[in-house]
């Protein structure tokens, strides 16, 4: 009989990420929703190989402080719930799962600047391992780059479609937002 054991946090995060990040389009959706929730008026999106190799979202939203950036990559941390109730949600996202889930299965680079700071800060999550924040350059808002999607769970890559199909699904997500 198999012995029951507690899973390590890294594996728990990778499993949870599968609920949020199924393919490049789902990662892109989460990033664009975050930009919109931050009040962005302009959002630039770059995809390489249908988002499999890279997804970069640059926005002119409110940005984040280094402390908020560190919290944003923790599971269940959010700025979008005004109190302890789910009755008063006015944002696209609120669960605090997107960034930690993406960071658990890829390389996530988060660069942001907000009012009161003379330079931006960059924080990197590589397969769940955090480095930073460190000083960076960015004029306004946030830039989030996701590279090597599913590097921590390569079996997920087998379920992706062609680059063209993944690119089309990313375009569909953006049109719907």
List where the protein language model places each region.
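N-terminal phosphate-binding caps/lids of nucleotide- and nucleic-acid-binding domains
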Residues: 1-177
């Amino acid at each position: 009989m198999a012995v029951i054991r507690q899973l390590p946090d890294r594996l728990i995060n990778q499993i949870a990420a599968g609920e949020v990040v199924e393919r490049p389009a789902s990662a892109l959706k989460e990033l664009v929703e975050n930009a919109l929730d931050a009040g962005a008026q302009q959002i630039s999106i770059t995809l390489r190989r249908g988002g499999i190799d890279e997804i970069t979202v640059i926005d002119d939203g409110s940005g984040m402080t280094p402390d908020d950036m560190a919290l944003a990559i923790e599971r269940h941390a959010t700025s979008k719930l005004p109190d302890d109730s789910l009755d008063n949600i006015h944002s696209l996202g609120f669960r605090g799962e997107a960034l930690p889930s993406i960071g658990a299965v890829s390389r996530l680079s988060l660069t942001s600047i907000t009012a009161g700071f003379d330079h931006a800060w960059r924080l990197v999550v590589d397969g769940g391992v955090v480095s930073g924040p460190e000083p960076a350059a960015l004029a306004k808002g946030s830039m989030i780059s996701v590279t090597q999607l599913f590097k921590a769970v390569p079996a997920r890559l087998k379920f992706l479609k062609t680059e063209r199909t993944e690119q089309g699904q990313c375009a569909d997500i953006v049109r719907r937002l």
